[in-house]
Amino acid sequence: LQKAAGEGYAAEVFLTAERTMEGIGFTIEGRADGIFTDEDGTVVIDEIKTTAAPTDAITEDMNPCHWAQGMVYGAICAEQRELETLDVRLTYYQIDTDEIIRYTRHFSAAELDAFLNDLLRQYLPWARRQLDWVEARNRSLGALQFPFPAYRPGQRALAGEVYRACAAGKAEQKGGTRLFCQAPTGIGKTMSALFPALKAMGEGKGEKIFYLTARNTTQAAAEDALARLRAADPALSLRSVTLSAKEKAC
């Protein structure tokens, strides 16, 4: 649909905006499927949805979230281009019949701006809880101690390298900070990786840690390491989840 739209149709347009509400900063971003100017000179936000719903079920009000997405993109676009009005169009493609159904609504920039602000206002309570949680988590990670009386030979050096890699963050010219380690069995590699990574996250050097394993035994080792950290510090504020392959879960 995007390729067939013509030369004046800009596909996959990245949109981003910064808003502050009650002291909390928000970054809103996404990709509009298409933006173009119609024959009347009106800018149109085109949101394309693929659906298997029967044709008679593809109504203008089939899914309010589809309009909401287009309206948020419209609010950002209107702000960036200093537009007074624009159109939001929903384009539905029925995969079984190849039928294309379109609906268009006209909005003022003021309407779209008010809509976006109302969404953020509804989101505020969750944002506050999230900020409070991150503050409590980082505070507890700052007080976290190594859960063993002493490091094993080579373990402190490995943990130090992991911490430095995490603390360095991304180096754009190198595609990010990478650390490749090789160590013998029994050195305590799992704790040597998790503990310093958690300490770095507690200092604001990261938001999440992904620990990827190829075997069930190494997955269990990571879970055991987290359990040991929690046992050593019952006040630790830390959330973790284990994701397994669908083939293993079924």
Regions found by a protein language model. Give the residues of each.
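Conserved Walker A/P-loop ATP-binding site and its immediately adjacent core
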Residues: K208-R228, V241-A249
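Acidic-basic catalytic patches of nuclease active cores, encompassing PD-(D/E)XK
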Residues: L1-R19
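Polybasic (Lys/Arg-rich)
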Residues: E111-A143
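Walker A/P-loop NTP-binding motif
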Residues: Y163-A167, T190-K205, A225-L229
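Short glycine-/polar-rich loops that comprise or flank the Walker A/P-loop
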Residues: E84-L86, K205-E207, L236-R239
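Walker A/P-loop
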Residues: A168-P196, E207-I209
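Mg2+/Mn2+-dependent nuclease catalytic core
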Residues: A17-D113
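Conserved pre-motif I regulatory segment
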Residues: W133-Q182
